[in-house]
């Protein structure tokens, strides 16, 4: 976290740091393109999937393949980032998270879950999506879709990390704004509106900004942010 007491945006005068920030931003753009290249697997539905699978299995098979691709892409992407930029979002934090922040994160996670449940007739979103007539195929389809969405969420939190690190290099001081969350909203959030047909697409898009807020409050802890993002998405 930035410790400069000046909360105005002040760009770093060091050209090397500005160039470094551009590398972080370029990496974030590449990450977005790489993750949503998974949508190209839809092009295989007609020549391949429709001849082998029928009904809901088409979408299930697509989600499995796309999720595997995203996790593999992010794995290779992370290795490249660690080698070229010498950073990793998975570094351990020497100091434990203060109890006050844990309590705040708990409230910021539980409140939107309960609020969404209230709008859905006091049902968790997970129950609402499953419906009243639960079958094995319904459970399989939802589990696979959550796997696919979890893969995209992993990429989104990684993007938030890259944007925040890029801003650290670009600015010597800045307001405590979730710039990474705004970037995730404008990239992953917009892509979700374009590529998904869920009744919750708008909610999912707005949550990307929320993840950026959680990331900063957690002290930039990737694992904490990703875990809370999964809970918010599923429930």
Predicted features and spans:
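Alpha-helical transmembrane segments in multi-pass membrane proteins
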Residues: 19-84, 105-106
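Alpha-helical transmembrane segments
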Residues: 31-35, 70-75, 114, 154-161, ...
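Juxtamembrane helix-loop-helix connectors linking adjacent transmembrane helices
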Residues: 44-60, 81-173
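Aromatic-anchored segments of alpha-helical transmembrane domains
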Residues: 31-40, 112-120, 185-194, 229-235
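N-terminal juxtamembrane cytosolic/stromal segments of multi-pass membrane proteins
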Residues: 1-25, 83-97
């Amino acid at each position: 976290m930035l410790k400069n007491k000046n909360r105005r945006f002040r760009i770093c005068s060091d050209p090397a740091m500005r160039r470094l920030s551009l590398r972080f931003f370029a990496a974030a753009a590449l990450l977005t393109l790489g993750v949503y290249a998974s949508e190209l697997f839809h092009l295989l539905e007609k020549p391949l999937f429709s001849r082998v699978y029928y009904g809901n299995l088409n979408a299930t098979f697509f989600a499995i393949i796309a999720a595997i691709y995203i996790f593999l892409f992010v794995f290779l992407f992370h290795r490249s980032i660690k080698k070229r930029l010498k950073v990793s979002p998975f570094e351990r934090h020497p100091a434990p998270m203060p109890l006050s922040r844990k309590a705040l994160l708990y409230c910021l996670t539980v409140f939107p879950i309960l609020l969404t449940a209230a709008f859905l007739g006091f049902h968790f979103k997970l129950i609402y999506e499953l419906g009243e007539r639960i079958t094995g195929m319904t459970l399989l389809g939802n589990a696979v879709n959550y796997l696919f969405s979890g893969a995209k969420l992993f990429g989104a939190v990684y993007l938030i990390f890259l944007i925040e690190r890029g801003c650290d290099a670009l600015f010597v001081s800045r307001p405590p704004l979730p710039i990474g969350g705004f970037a995730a909203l404008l990239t992953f959030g917009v892509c979700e509106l374009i590529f998904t047909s869920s009744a919750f697409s708008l909610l999912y898009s707005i949550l990307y900004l929320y993840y950026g807020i959680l990331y900063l409050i957690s002290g930039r802890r990737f694992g904490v942010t990703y875990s809370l993002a999964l809970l918010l998405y599923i429930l």
